[in-house]
Amino acid sequence: MSLRRRILPLWRGELSSDAAISLGLTRYWFQRIKLRLIGNFNIMSKVALFPGSFDPFTSGHLNILTRALTIFDEVVVAVGINQAKRGFYTMSQREDIIAQATKDLKGVKVISYDGLTVDLCKELGIKHIVRGVRNMTDFDNEQAVADANRHLAPDIDTIIIPTAQEYSHISSSAVRDLLSHHGDLSRFIPDWVVLPEII
């Protein structure tokens, strides 16, 4: 069953907490996610923005993107430019890594941007932002950002997707640390992705 068909009853209030648990959600997650997502979400809106620094793009990011594509026809992966911070990989390298990771996915576009994410959404006419969370600390942080974005742009909603358990240990910072120490990346990066050499 697609993610869309599984989560629509959750948004509509038709799915009990016991049923949600059978789909892999804890009771606490069920309540938090239901409150976060119910908003003004319109499932008929077919395009979403998936923003991040993606330095680099990981198997966890790919998991979130793949699941988002079961909800939306198109997801724009937006690589954020932080002028005050030197990235581990250049912008073009990050875009290339994402292109490799998503080569078999339909409906994915990759762009880079600077400035506010909600301003990019307005520019592109996108009404939904997709974010992935690995734990409740991530969730609380994303909820705070989502609430701030709603003040700036009330018509733009954030869709928070919990990372599948097998990817919950993965982060870009962990990948960077492994790269710096020549560690094993097989559980962190899709095996068909070739990362650029670090000079």
Predicted regions and their residues:
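Hydrophobic alpha-helical elements and their junctions with loops/disorder across both membrane
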Residues: 16, 26-27, 33, 55, ...
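Short, Lys/Arg-enriched N-terminal segments with co-localized hydrophobic residues
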Residues: 29-43
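A cross-taxon signal for low-complexity, glycine/charged-rich
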Residues: 3-6, 10-15, 19-20, 24-31
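Nucleotidyltransferase catalytic core that binds NTPs
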Residues: 40-199
